[in-house]
């Protein structure tokens, strides 16, 4: 049996379906690793993580490598850690401009406390696509956004 290079196969000769659900570190994606990743059967998305604005150029390069290797643009997806709300919209819009679907996650510290309402409202604006596509973050009017939960 001849398999494509980089394809993951089980011992029974069946393709292995993968899902790196915590987000791949874009800094580790080279043309070679992108080629290997493109050869995998993905359950859904190729997930990357964008915790800070400093990661945007790195993610842009990794996405280019993945596209060149044959990963469909519709499969590119990125977690956006929402800790600094004023910085988060810029990251979301930059990812969308790159053709990457963002998914906002409010920052939850180690004590397990609830994230601030502003972070949760931002995540709703990003993750509910109909809302996100209908208005900008600045024009998003969520009454829960206006109430502070003391954090």
Q: Where do the PLM segments sit?
A:
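Auxiliary Fe-S-binding modules of radical SAM enzymes
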Residues: 69-71, 79-151
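Core AdoMet radical
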Residues: 1-62, 73-83, 101-106
